[in-house]
Amino acid sequence: YNIGQIAAGEFQFGVAQSDWQYHAVNGSSKWQGKQYSDLRAVFSVHNEPFQIWARKKAKIKNFSDLEGKVVNIGNPGSGQRGTMEELMKAMGVDNSFFKSTTELTSSEQVKALCDGKIDAFGYSVGFPNGAMEQAATCAAKASPINLTGPEVQGLIDGADYYAQAVIPKGTYTKQKKDATTFGVKAT
């Protein structure tokens, strides 16, 4: 969203994920045919690991456990949605892999998880994060899952803007293990 507003001249400055900045500058992915080569990063703010949070009762420990579950893939046009789609492509799945998908915004997904309306959601966000703490402490007793394996490593190796990331144990209430994933930087 912010990159589009800058490109349209509506914003002079904005924060974006480094992967979407890369795509805008290079005219790739959703920016194909709309290259914005004048876009510049002023600085990197923090790491934003891509996190999939799952309710405890859903028994989701890794990506393959999402099969047949209700998963929020993010609202159309969001960085959250774009990263989830790239991960799904790397894993060789589409929406039919899940029981169903939702397109909730980042501000709606934690309530849906806590209310039992979804089993999991994916989100690129720095840590610690208040909304993720809410997911960990509500009735869902959610936690971040590991995103590892050759498909994820291929995703990291194939993109200059991705790197391995770890959410250290104890970052969130009752998080007893490190969660290994991948991520970007906010620029």
List each language-model region with its residue ranges.
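Extracellular/periplasmic catalytic domains that process cell-envelope and extracellular macromolecules
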Residues: 7-8, 33-35, 44-46, 65, ...
